[in-house]
Amino acid sequence: MRKKKRKKHTKTITKIVLFSGILIGGGIGIVTIMNRNVPEKRLMEYMKYIEKGEYEQMYAMLDQKKSSMNSKEEFIERNSKIYEGIEMSDLSITDITAKRKENGNAAVSYTTNMQTAAGNVEFTNNAVFSHNWTGYHLIWQDQLIFPELSATDKVQVTLEEAKRGNILDRNGRQLAGEGTASSVGIVPGRMENREDTIKKLAEYLGIGADEIEDKLKADWVKADSFVPVATIPKIQEVDLLTVNPDETVLEEKEKQDTLLKIPGIMLSDVKVRTYYLKEAASHLVGYVQAVTAEDLQEHKGEGYRTNSVIGKTGLETLYEKELKGTDGCEICIVDANGNKKSVIAYEPRKDGEDIHITIDGDLQSTLYEQFKEDRGCSVALNPYTGEVLALVSTPSYDNNDFVRGMDNSQWSALNENEDRPLYNRFRQTWCPGSTFKPVIAAIGLKVGAFTANDDFGNEGLAWQKDSSWGDYTVTTLHDYEPVILKNALIYSDNIYFAKAALKIGADQLMQSLNQIGFNQELPFDIKMSESQYSNMDKIETEIQLADSGYGQGQILVNPLHLASIYTAFLNDGNMIKPYLHADGGSTSSEIWIKDAFSPQIVSEVMEGLEGVVNNPEGTGYGACREDIRLAGKTGTAELKATKEDTSGTEIGWFTVFTTDRDTKNPILLISMVENVKDIGGSGYVVEKDKAILDEYLGNE
C-alpha cells in the first residue's frame, strides 16, 4: 500500500512540474507575441541584432515585399559591409517615440548612439513598420543605416595611419624610427621565363617557390602589377662609399644587382620600422611585428587593425601605449560617382609619442663591439643620478630581421645557436664571484661582526673551519700580510671573506641582503630577475654560508641590481634607483634604499676598492689611469658540480667606476663574460673594459 501511494505521489509531482513548464514556455511565447505588437520593442529587437551582427535575424524581421532590398543576400551584404567596415560597436537607441497610423502601420522616431572607427556617432532617425495579424514588420530602407544614405550611395571609410613614435637616446640619436627598406617583387607581365624567374628569386630569398606562386595568383594581380614577395635591407650608397665597406653589404649589393638583371624582378622602396644600432641594442630596444589574431583579441577596442604592428619585445613593448598613436579616420557617404555627400564622423590622426631614454648610443655600440664574440652582458650607469647608460647582451641578433621577416634558415640559425643570441643576459641573475666581496664587507662592518683593521690571520692558500667540513676547503691565490679588509679586497682573498660570512652568521646575512633588495623586484622599467642568496628559503649549511662570503654558494645577482648596490659606495651609503625613461630631461637622482651603509663604512670599503685598481698588486690594476681615479672589483665565479670538478666553467666579472663626482662623464660599469677559464679569467674582462673606458672617458 505504501509503495502504491508513493508512486501515485510521484506521478502527481511530475504532472505539476510538466504543467508548470508548459505555463512558463507559454509565458515566453506570449511575451514574444506581445513584443511583435509593440513597434518600439520590435525596433529595439532589430537594433540588438545589429549589435550582435546577426544579419539573418534582422532580415527575418522585415516586411520583405515593401522593403527596398531585392534579396536576402543583398541585404546581408549591404548591412554587414557597412557596419563591419565602420567597426560599429556599443550600439544603443534612446528617445523612442511611436506613432500609429490609421492603416495599422507605425512610425518610430529614435536617437542612435554607436562607437565607430572614427569615434562616437549620434543621430536621430525614423523607422516605419507595417502591421498584419502576425505583428509589426520593419519596412527597410537604406536610410535606416544612416539618414542621409540612399540606395545608390556608399559608406566610405578612410584611414590615416598614425606614425609610431621614435625611441631616442640621451643625445637625441634615433634608436628606433621610420626607415627605408627594399621590397623585392615581380611584375608578371615582364617575366620572360616564369618558372626560372620564380626559382631564382626563391633561392635568393630562401623561401619556397610555391610561396611566390601563391602571391602571384592573388585576385588583384594583373600583368603590370608589382607583386611584393619579401622585404630586404636597402643598400645605401653611403655604405658603399666608406673606406672599408662591410663585406656583407658588398655581397648583398652583388646579389641584388644579379637579381635586377632578371626580367620581371624589381625593387621598390618601402617605409619600415628601423633599428639603427642593430645587434648592439636589440635585446634592449626589441622589435615590432604585425599583429596576430590573438593580439587583436587581447587588445580589442584599443585601435589595432589587421595591418597594425605591435611591440613584441624590449622597449617596443614596454612603451607600446605611448609609441603606438591613434590612426585618423573619416567615415563619409559618397554618391554613385564617388562624390562626398556628407561626413558621418571624423577622428584626426594622433601620432605616437617619442620616447627619450637615458642610454648613450655610442657607449652601447662600443660595449657591443668589444664583447660581441663573447657570451656576456654589460650594464653602465651614472652612479650619482641612476641614469642607465648602457644595457648590452652578447651575442646578439639584428632586430631589423624580425621586422622585414626571416626565412626558415635564418630563424633556425638563431634559435638553434648554442651561444643563444636571443637570450637576454642582462635581465638574468648570475653567480657574482668576488664582485660580491665588497657587499659582504659592508654588511659585516654594519652589523659589527668585525672592523676594517681586524687581522683575520694568514691561513696560507687553503683553509677550513674545522674537521666537520671533511675534505672541503676554501682556497685563495695570494699570500699576504696583514690580513685586513683593505688587503683582502686588493688581493681578492676568498678565505678572508669566507671567515667574514661566518662571523656575520646566516640569519644576519640573509636579513641584511633582504634589506638591500634581495628576493624582491628591482624598481626598474624593464623587469629583471630577482637576486637570491639561496635556491631554497635560506642559507642552510655552514659551508654554503662560507661560500656565500666570496660570491659563490647559491648567490645569484642581477648585474643592474649589483650596480645599484655599488652606487652606495659613492653616495654616502645610499643606494640609487636606476632609471631608463628620461622624463622631461631631468637628471636628478632618486634614492632606492636610504642608509644601506654608513658613510664611515663606505670610506673603509672604498679604500680597498681603490686599491684594487690603483695598487700594482690589485687584480684590476690593468684598468688604472693617470688622469681619472677609478675604483672597482674583479670577480671570477666558478661553475662546477663539486670542488674537485675540473670540467666546470668560469664567469669573469669586472665592476669599475669613476670616484670623483666632478668627473665630466661619471660612470659605473659592470661587465660579465661566460667561459673565461682559458682566456685569462677576469683579466680578460678588465682588458675589454679598459678599452671601453679609454674611449668613453677620453682625456679629461
Which sequence ranges carry the predicted segments?
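Sec-dependent signal peptide cleavage junction
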Residues: G27-M44
